[in-house]
Structures are given as structure tokens and as C-alpha cells.
């Protein structure tokens, strides 16, 4: 288990995050409060990992109460599981943001550490996943990722992994360009969601690059 120092939520910090992701009062801001914890266990000598080969696999957020400027919070984390896969390892990390002894936000992150030989072999293609026919969406919106968004997001989020900010490094680990932070992809995609949402869960299936266009489609299910 890992405990981070108490964090005061500066309103300018929240505003900077919102401006970068283009969403006032972004639901995803709490992810920025746990970055010190990630830095802590990544540097733990008992946990050996090549951060340069890490990508975000899945993210869950559960909201118990809203955060406000000048809140003093205490982030906590624990490693829930480490799974070995043919193409690498998955690290499952649970996190909690505490305020006055109460859980305000729960998070769960599944991080995928790509193996050294995870690229498809020549002529090898992954089978496409079947599309689910949901009918026409109730609404949709599109955003084109600016060239400098990975760099700008690295500031307020604290996610400055060089695969997001250093082109040469990104190429050295197999990407053709820097890639957008998974949590930035999540924040941009979640921009039209209601602020009283109780839970959000996402799965990242492929990297998002500067210049890509993200389209968020929403289907109402009657609930």
C-alpha cells in the first residue's frame, strides 16, 4: 500500500486542467491527485518496470462526493494484482482520494507493460471485434487532437512519461509519434457527460495520436 502527502486543490490547478481538456469542471480532474503515488511505486525497488513501455489499458472512476477548490485531500493506493500475459504484464492499481477521513473518489487503473516483442509478426492480423448494433446514437461530438495536447496535458496532470512528450523516445519504444495520455483521451471524450455522474469506466483499445479525431457517441438506455 502507498500513501501520498496531503494535497491542497488549488483552484488555478483545476482551471488549468479544465482548459487543457476543454471541459469546465472536468469529472476526470481527480486523476491528477494520485500522480505522486504512481511515481512512488514506480520507483519502489521491489517493483521493477520499464515505464517507457507502459500504456493505459482501462480506467474506472467512482464518485462519492464532489471535490471543490481548496479541499485538502489524502491520496491512497495499493497494487491489487499483477497479471502475466503473452504480450506483457498488466498492473492493476486501486486508488482512493480521502477528505476528512471519507472516500471522495475511488479509482482503479489497469496499466499494460508491453513486452519487448509485442509487435504483430509480418502477415499477422488481429481479428476485428464484432460491432454491436445499438442503432443511431442520441448524440455525438468530435474533437481533433491538437499537436501539442500531450505536452500541455502533462503539466496539470503530472503525466510526463516521455512517450507523451519526447518524439525520439516514443519512436524508440515502437510508436510513430508521441501518443496522447490515456486519461487525457478519457477527459476529452467525457466532456459532454453530466456532472452528477456516479461512475465511469473506459477501456483503451489503441493509441491516440496528435491529429487524430475522437468521436464520442452517446446512446440513451432509459435509465
Residue ranges and their predicted role:
Residues 1-58, 118-125, 130-194:
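Hot-dog-fold acyl-thioester-processing enzymes
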Residues 58-145, 204-210, 215-223:
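HotDog/MaoC-like acyl-thioester-processing domains
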Amino acid at each position: 500500500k502507498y500513501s501520498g502527502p496531503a494535497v491542497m486543490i488549488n483552484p488555478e490547478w483545476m482551471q488549468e486542467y479544465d482548459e487543457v481538456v476543454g471541459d469546465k469542471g472536468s469529472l476526470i480532474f481527480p486523476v491528477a491527485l494520485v500522480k505522486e503515488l504512481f511515481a512512488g511505486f514506480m520507483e519502489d525497488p521491489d517493483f521493477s518496470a520499464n515505464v517507457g513501455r507502459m500504456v493505459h489499458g482501462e480506467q474506472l472512476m467512482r464518485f462519492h462526493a464532489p471535490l471543490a477548490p481548496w479541499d485538502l485531500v489524502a491520496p491512497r493506493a495499493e497494487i491489487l494484482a499483477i497479471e502475466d500475459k503473452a504480450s506483457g504484464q498488466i498492473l492493476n492499481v486501486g486508488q482512493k482520494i480521502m477528505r476528512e477521513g471519507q472516500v471522495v473518489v475511488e479509482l482503479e487503473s489497469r496499466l499494460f507493460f508491453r513486452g519487448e516483442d509485442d509487435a504483430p509478426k509480418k502477415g499477422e492480423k488481429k481479428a476485428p471485434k464484432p460491432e454491436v448494433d445499438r442503432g443511431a446514437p442520441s448524440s455525438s461530438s468530435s474533437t481533433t487532437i491538437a499537436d501539442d495536447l500531450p505536452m500541455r496535458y502533462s503539466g496539470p496532470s503530472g503525466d510526463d512519461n516521455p512517450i507523451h512528450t519526447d518524439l525520439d523516445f516514443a519512436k524508440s519504444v515502437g510508436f510513430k509519434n508521441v501518443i496522447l495520455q490515456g486519461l487525457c483521451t478519457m477527459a476529452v471524450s467525457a466532456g459532454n457527460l453530466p456532472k452528477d455522474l456516479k461512475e465511469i469506466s473506459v477501456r483503451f483499445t489503441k493509441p491516440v495520436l496528435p491529429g487524430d479525431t475522437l468521436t464520442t457517441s452517446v446512446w440513451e438506455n432509459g435509465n
